[in-house]
């Protein structure tokens, strides 16, 4: 939890409590339904929560913004972002029902009011959103093809509507077809831990 406060020191008391509660909740649920590698659960705050919050180093969502988290798994990046941006509406979607159940139970336990959930494949989701966020679910080209239909034409943030992905490693080849509308941000510029040396936030305007 200290690592979250290190980089986000201005959290409200409620946000601090919500972030602090995540550890025991994920330990408990992960023992029943595996949503995080058992070897990695001890690194929950660095590898999952802070990594999710890396998106906030690229954009500050305005109140009323609608965001879909595609392939949310156990709730990443959607749940940490929903805590950080309580006036933004998050819709968490995953094709695996038991993972959606974990994310739903965790969100309910910490009292999140700005999240909805859906057990469905991405192709089935028809709602419009300002942004789609995702964490290394599939190659960028496949992701853009699927979510183009979900991006609202109305812009209400400083950044044009589009896709924001958390990815790692070498991305030049993957982003090449979209290079004129894509920005790659290295999280090593924001977070000093070794884990973030190869981690990126990829924004594609759609």
From Swiss-Prot:
Gene3D superfamilies listed in its UniProt record: Vaccinia Virus protein VP39
Record localization: Cytoplasm
Binding locations of S-adenosyl-L-methionine: 71, 76, 122-123, 135
Keyword field contains Hydrolase: no
GO cellular component entries: cytosol
GO MF, any single term: rRNA (guanine-N7-)-methyltransferase activity
InterPro entries xrefs: rRNA_ssu_MeTfrase_G, SAM-dependent_MTases_sf
Keyword terms of this UniProt record: Cytoplasm, Methyltransferase, rRNA processing, S-adenosyl-L-methionine, Transferase
Presence of the UniProt keyword Cell inner membrane in the record: no
NCBIfam families per record: rsmG_gidB (TIGR00138)
The family this protein is said to belong to: Belongs to the methyltransferase superfamily. RNA methyltransferase RsmG family.
Main function: Specifically methylates the N7 position of a guanine in 16S rRNA.
Official protein name in the record: Ribosomal RNA small subunit methyltransferase G
